[in-house]
UniProtKB/Swiss-Prot annotation:
Gene that this polypeptide is encoded by: PROB1
Organism name: Homo sapiens (Human)
Lineage: Eukaryota, Metazoa, Chordata, Craniata, Vertebrata
One GO CC annotation: nucleoplasm
Protein's recorded name: Proline-rich basic protein 1
Region listing for Disordered, in residue ranges: 1-111, 139-164, 196-236, 259-460, 488-678, 690-883, 991-1015
Amino acid composition bias (Gly residues), ranges on this chain: 84-94
Length: 1015
C-alpha cells in the first residue's frame, strides 16, 4: 500500500502558504478549471508542480516515482497533469507543502490520497488550515501508514512522470485512523482537468473542501458484513422455505400426527443407520421425525436431487419440483399444473412417506415394530437387511420395503433405485435380484438420476421417494420394483407381508387405522381409494392374502403392495414403480407419467417377460419410453393421475400390470392406480382443471389407460408415448384402451394364465374390490374403471379429485370403501365389462378409431356402461372424457362410447386425432352432427351445453336423455364410442366437426364433450 508519509511540516510553515492558494482551495468552484488568477501569489513557475515530482516525492515515491496508482472513479474523472503552476501552493517557497497527501491503497487496490484533514478544517484561512492540516496530518498521516489498514478512505494521488498528479477523492474517509478525534475531516482535492495544451499554464481547479464523513465503516466492513448477512439470510430463507414447503401445514400436520406415534425413533435410528449419504441426510432428518426435519429432509432431498438442477434450495422442494415436472428433462414431470399437484402430492407423499415411515414404525410397532429399525435399516442396509435379514420373519415389513427383498437382494435393488448410494451398492448386491435389478437398477438408477436431475420427479418421486426415500418410498418404489422382481419370492411373504404393507400402507395413507394394525389399516386402506390402491397394489397382498394360492398374482400384488405404499408415498413413483415395479418404480418417479408408459413398458417387460430377465431388456426399452415420457412428461401425469384418481391411474397401472402384468399385470396396476391416485387427484385436477370432472368421469380412461397398459405391449405404448406428449394423451391412451381391451384379453389371459383365472380373478376381483374401494385395481384399474366410473363418479370420482386425500386420508379411502361392496360386484361386472371391452378394444384396435383416447374411454364406458352407465347416467357428463389432442394440444370432451364404431380421425386443420363415433345404427352420413338438444341439456354438465349450431337430425338410434350412455353401448356395438366433436374448443359447428354423426343421444353428449376445450 502506498502510504505517503508526509515529512512533518513545521506548525508554522502552513501559515507561510499564500492566502490566494488557500482561497483557491477554499473556493467552492466545483470542478471548473480556471487559470490561476494573474494576481495569484504563486507564479506559474511557482508550485510543487513547477518543481516537478521532486516537490512531492513523498506522495508518490511510495508507489514508485512515476508509478501511477489506480485511480478511483472520482480520480479518473478529475485527472489532469498538473502544470508546473498547479493550483496547490506546493512550492517550497509557498511554504511547507500542505501536509503531504497520504497515499493509501484501498482494499480495492485503488490509491487514495488523503490530504491533511484538520479537525477543524474551516475555510477560514490557508494558514490556519494548513497548520491544522499539518498538525492533524502528521498524526493522521503517521498513523495512516498503519492507516492503510484503517479503512479510512483516502483520496488517491498518482504522479505522472511529468509531475502531474491525479487526485482522487475518496469521499468516505474514515476518521478511525489516528485522527478519529478530528471533528470533521475535510479533504482538499485538487482536481485538474487533463489538458494537453500549455501544461506550463497552471490550470487549477479550485480545491473543493469535501467534508468527509466517516462512512459507518460501510465500505469495507459494512459491505463485507452485511453481504454475508444477506447470504446468511438467503440461506435462512431457503431453510425456512424448504421446511415450510416440505412441512407446509400438511406435512407438519401429518408429521405432528405421526411424530407422536413415531416418537419412538426406530425409523430415526434406522434412518440414521441408513447408510445412504444422500438418503441418510434426508432420512436422518426424516428419521428425526420432526416436522421441520421432515420438511427439511424433503427440501434437502429436493435440494440434494434438484440442487444441481436449480440453486434455490427451498424451491426445489416444491416449486422447483413443479417446474422440473413442467420442464422435466429426464422424464420428469408431468405438467405445469402438476405444480399444485406437486404440492398436494408432495404433502401427500410426504405424509405418505412419513406415513410409510410411520407405517414402518407404526406398522412395525403395530405389526413389525422390531422390524421398524430393520425396515429402516433395510433402507440403509436394505441389501443386507433385506437380503440378510430374513424378511420372512418380518415379511409384512419386509414386503413393504423389502418384504421379499430380504431373501431377494432386491433390497439393494430397492436401495439402488431409491438410494442412489445404496443403489450403487445395490449394484453389488445386485447379484441376487440384480438380474432384474441390474436392468431395473440401470433403468431405475438412470431414472433416479433423472429424478435427481428432475426435481419434479423428485417432487413426485422424491416427495414420495425422497420423502420416503429414507424409509420406504424409494425403497418401496424400488422394492416395488424388486418386488416385481421379487414378487415371486415375495409372494409367499406377501401373504404375511400384507399386514405390514397395510400397516405401513395404512400409515402410508394418513389413515388412523394404519397405526393400529396393518390389516386393520390395510382394510381401511383397502376401502380408501388410496387404500384401495394399496389394497389393489396390495391387492396382490389382498390376493396374496385372499388369493395366496395365486402367488404369481400375489407376487405381483406384493410388488403392488410394496409399491402400493410406495405408490401412496410415491403415488406417481409407486405408480410407476408398482407398474414397472422393478424398473419403472424407480424410473417412474423420474417420469411418473412416463412410468405409466414405462410401467407398461417396463412392467410388462420387467414383470411380464419375467421379472428379472424381461425386466432387464425391457428396462432398456422402457427407459427410452421413460425418457420420451419424461421428456413428454405431460402424458405421464395423466397416467399417475389416472391411476390414482380413476381410470387414468388404473390404465397406467394396467399398462404396467397388463404389459408387465402378464404376471403382475393386474396387481401392479392396482399399485399404479394407488400412486397415480394421488397424482390423479392432484395432477388431473391441476393437470386437467378445466375438465377434471369430464376427465374423471371418464373412469374408462382408467380402464383405457389400463388397456393402454395392455396395449403398451403394442399400441398402447406408442399411445402412451404419444399420450405422454400431451397431458391428456392419457385420455388418448385411454382411447387406445380399446386396444388395451384387446390387449387386455391378452393381458387378462396372461394374468389369468398367470393366476389361473382364480388367481387372476382373485386379483381382478380383489383388485376390483380395491378398485371399488380405491378404484385402483390393476386389472380392476381397467375393469374397475367401470366400477370406478360408476363409483368413481359417485365416490371414486369425487375421491379421485380428492384421490390424494382418499388415498392419503383414510376417510377418502374409507369413503371408497363403502363403495367397495358395490365395487366388489362391480369388479365382476367391471372385469366382465373389461373383458367385453377387451374384445371391443380388439375390435376397436382393428378400427382406426382405436388409436386415440376417445375410443379407449368410450370402450371403457361401453363395457362399463352397464354398471357404469347406471352410475354414470346420474351424470351424463361423466360419460364424456376430456381428451387432449397431442398434435394440437386441444382438449376434447368426448362422450362416453355408446358403442358405436369409434373412428379415430385426424383433423389436419387442428392436427388432432378425433375419435368419432360412427353409430352403426345411423345409416345417415357418419359426419352428421346432432344437436346436443337431441339428448337434452340435462345430460350435459353446464360447461357442455348443447350447441344449437351443431343441431342435426338425431341419428336413428338417438339415445334417450336417460339412457344415452347405455343405449350407445347397446346400439353402438363394441367399439363404437362417443362421437368426438372436435369443435376446436368452440361450439362452432364450423370447426371441422369430424364425422360427428353420433346418435342423437351422443350428439348432445358430444356437444358436451364436443365442445372441445382447447386449454
Amino acid at each position: 500500500m502506498l502510504t505517503a508519509l508526509a515529512p512533518p511540516a513545521l506548525p508554522g510553515i502552513p501559515r507561510q502558504l499564500p492566502t490566494a492558494p488557500a482561497r483557491r482551495q477554499d473556493s467552492s468552484g466545483s470542478s471548473g478549471s480556471y487559470y490561476t488568477a494573474p494576481g495569484s501569489p504563486e507564479p506559474p513557475d511557482v508550485g510543487p508542480d513547477a518543481k516537478g515530482p521532486a516537490n512531492w516525492p513523498w506522495v508518490a515515491p511510495g508507489r514508485g516515482a512515476g508509478a501511477q496508482p489506480r485511480l478511483s472513479v472520482s480520480a479518473q474523472n478529475s485527472r489532469q497533469r498538473h502544470g508546473p503552476g498547479s493550483g496547490f501552493p506546493r512550492g517550497p517557497g509557498s511554504g511547507p507543502r500542505p501536509p503531504q497527501p497520504q497515499l493509501r491503497t484501498l482494499p480495492s487496490g485503488e490509491m487514495e490520497v488523503i490530504f491533511g484533514v484538520g479537525p477543524l478544517f474551516g475555510c477560514s484561512g490557508a494558514d490556519d488550515r494548513e497548520a491544522q492540516q499539518q498538525f492533524t496530518e502528521p498524526a493522521f498521516i503517521s498513523p495512516l501508514p498503519p492507516g492503510p489498514a484503517s479503512p479510512a478512505a483516502v483520496p488517491r494521488q498518482s504522479q505522472v512522470p511529468d509531475g502531474g498528479s491525479r487526485w482522487a477523492t475518496y469521499l468516505e474517509l474514515r476518521p478511525r485512523g489516528p485522527s478519529p478525534a478530528a471533528p470533521a475531516q475535510f479533504e482538499c482535492v485538487e482536481v485538474a482537468l487533463e489538458e494537453g495544451a500549455a501544461p506550463a499554464r497552471p490550470r487549477t481547479v479550485p480545491k473543493r473542501q469535501i467534508e468527509l464523513r466517516p462512512r459507518p465503516q460501510s465500505p469495507p466492513r459494512a459491505a463485507g458484513a452485511p453481504r454475508p448477512r444477506l447470504l446468511l439470510r438467503t440461506g435462512s430463507l431457503d431453510e425456512s422455505l424448504g421446511p415450510l414447503q416440505a412441512a407446509a401445514g400438511f406435512v407438519q400436520t401429518a408429521l405432528a400426527r405421526k411424530l407422536s406415534p413415531e416418537a419412538p425413533a426406530p425409523s430415526s435410528a434406522t434412518f440414521g443407520s441408513t447408510g445412504r449419504s444422500e438418503p441418510e441426510t434426508r432420512e436422518t432428518a426424516r428419521s428425526t421425525h420432526v416436522v421441520l426435519e421432515k420438511a427439511k429432509s424433503r427440501p434437502l432431498r429436493v435440494r440434494d436431487n434438484s440442487a444441481p438442477a436449480k440453486a434455490p434450495r427451498p424451491w426445489p422442494s416444491l416449486r422447483e419440483r413443479a417446474i422440473r415436472r413442467d420442464k422435466p428433462a429426464p422424464g420428469t414431470e408431468p405438467l405445469g399444473p402438476v405444480s399444485s399437484s406437486i404440492f398436494l402430492q408432495s404433502e401427500e407423499k410426504i405424509q405418505e412417506a412419513r406415513k410409510t415411515r410411520f407405517p414402518r414404525e407404526a406398522p412395525d410397532r403395530t405389526v413389525q415394530r422390531a422390524r421398524s429399525p430393520p425396515f429402516e435399516c433395510r433402507i440403509p442396509s436394505e441389501v443386507p437387511s433385506r437380503a440378510v435379514r430374513p424378511r420372512s420373519p418380518s415379511p409384512p415389513r419386509q414386503t413393504p420395503n423389502g418384504a421379499v427383498r430380504g431373501p431377494r437382494c432386491p433390497s439393494p435393488q430397492n436401495l439402488s433405485p431409491w438410494d442412489r448410494t445404496t443403489r450403487r451398492v445395490s449394484s453389488p448386491l445386485f447379484p441376487e435380484a440384480s438380474s432384474e435389478w441390474e436392468n431395473q437398477n440401470p433403468a431405475v438408477e438412470e431414472t433416479v438420476s433423472r429424478r435427481s436431475p428432475s426435481p419434479p420427479i423428485l417432487s413426485q418421486w422424491n416427495q414420495c421417494v425422497a420423502g420416503e426415500r429414507s424409509p420406504s418410498l424409494e425403497a418401496p418404489s424400488l422394492w416395488e420394483i424388486p418386488h416385481s422382481a421379487v414378487a415371486d419370492a415375495v409372494e409367499p411373504r406377501s401373504s404375511p407381508s400384507p399386514p405390514a404393507f397395510f400397516p405401513w400402507e395404512a400409515p402410508d395413507r394418513p389413515i388412523g387405522t394404519w397405526g393400529p394394525s396393518p390389516q386393520e389399516t390395510w382394510d381401511p386402506m383397502g376401502p380408501g381409494s388410496s387404500i384401495a390402491f394399496t389394497q389393489e397394489a396390495q391387492n396382490g397382498l389382498t390376493q396374496e392374502e385372499l388369493a395366496p394360492p395365486t402367488p404369481s398374482a400375489p407376487g405381483t400384488p406384493e410388488p403392488t403392495e410394496m409399491q402400493s405404499p410406495s405408490t401412496r408415498e410415491i403415488s406417481d413413483l409407486a405408480f410407476g414403480g408398482s407398474q414397472q415395479s422393478p424398473e419403472v418404480a424407480a424410473p417412474e418417479p423420474p417420469g411418473s407419467h412416463p412410468v405409466g408408459t414405462l410401467d407398461a413398458d417396463k412392467c410388462p417387460e420387467v414383470l411380464g417377460p419375467g421379472e428379472a430377465a424381461s425386466g432387464r431388456p425391457r428396462m432398456a426399452i422402457p427407459r427410452p419410453r421413460d425418457v420420451r415420457k419424461l421428456v413428454k412428461t405431460t402424458y405421464a401425469p395423466g397416467f399417475p393421475a389416472g391411476a390414482q384418481g380413476s381410470g387414468l391411474p388404473a390404465p397406467p397401472a394396467d399398462p404396467c400390470g397388463e404389459e408387465g402384468g402378464e404376471s403382475k399385470t393386474q396387481e401392479p396396476p392396482a399399485l399404479g392406480p394407488p400412486a397415480p391416485a394421488h397424482y390423479t387427484s392432484v395432477f388431473i385436477k391441476d393437470f386437467l382443471p378445466v375438465v377434471p370432472h369430464p376427465y374423471e368421469p371418464p373412469e374408462p380412461s382408467f380402464d383405457t389407460v389400463a388397456r393402454d397398459a395392455s396395449q403398451p405391449n403394442g399400441v398402447l405404448r406408442r399411445r402412451a408415448e404419444n399420450s405422454t406428449a400431451k397431458p391428456f394423451k392419457r385420455t388418448e391412451i385411454r382411447l387406445p384402451g380399446a386396444l388395451a381391451l384387446g390387449r387386455r384379453p391378452e393381458v387378462t389371459s396372461r394374468v389369468r394364465a398367470r393366476g389361473p383365472g382364480g388367481e387372476n380373478r382373485d386379483v381382478e376381483a380383489q383388485r376390483l374390490v380395491p378398485d371399488g374401494d380405491g378404484r385402483t385395481s390393476p386389472l380392476g384399474g381397467a375393469r374397475s374403471s367401470s366400477q370406478r366410473s360408476p363409483v368413481g363418479p359417485a365416490g371414486v370420482r369425487s375421491p379421485r379429485p380428492g384421490s390424494p386425500q382418499m388415498q392419503a386420508s383414510p376417510s377418502p379411502g374409507i369413503a371408497p370403501k363403502p363403495k367397495t361392496p358395490p365395487t366388489a360386484p362391480e369388479p365382476a361386472a367391471a372385469v366382465q365389462a373389461p373383458l367385453p371391452r377387451e374384445p371391443l378394444a380388439l375390435a376397436g384396435r382393428t378400427a382406426p378409431a382405436q388409436p386415440r383416447a376417445a375410443s379407449a374411454p368410450p370402450t371403457d364406458r361401453s363395457p362399463q356402461s352397464p354398471s357404469q352407465g347406471a352410475r354414470r347416467q346420474p351424470g351424463a357428463a361423466p360419460l364424456g372424457k376430456v381428451l387432449v389432442d397431442p398434435e394440437s394440444g386441444r382438449y376434447y370432451f368426448v362422450e362416453a362410447p355408446r358403442q358405436p364404431r369409434l373412428r379415430v380421425l385426424f383433423d389436419p386443420e387442428s392436427g388432432q386425432y378425433v375419435e368419432v363415433l360412427l353409430p352403426p345404427s345411423s345409416p345417415g352420413p357418419p359426419h352428421r352432427v346432432y344437436t346436443p338438444l337431441a339428448l337434452g341439456l340435462g345430460l350435459y354438465p353446464p360447461a357442455y351445453g348443447p350447441i344449437p349450431s351443431l343441431s342435426l337430425p338425431p341419428s336413428p338410434g338417438p339415445q334417450a336423455l336417460g339412457s344415452p350412455q347405455l343405449p350407445w353401448v347397446s346400439e353402438a356395438g363394441p367399439l363404437d364410442g362417443t362421437y368426438y366433436l372436435p369443435v376446436s374448443g368452440t361450439p362452432n359447428p364450423a370447426p371441422p366437426l369430424l364425422l360427428c354423426a353420433p346418435p342423437s343421444s351422443s350428439g348432445p353428449t358430444q356437444p358436451g364433450k364436443g365442445s372441445l376445450f382447447p386449454l
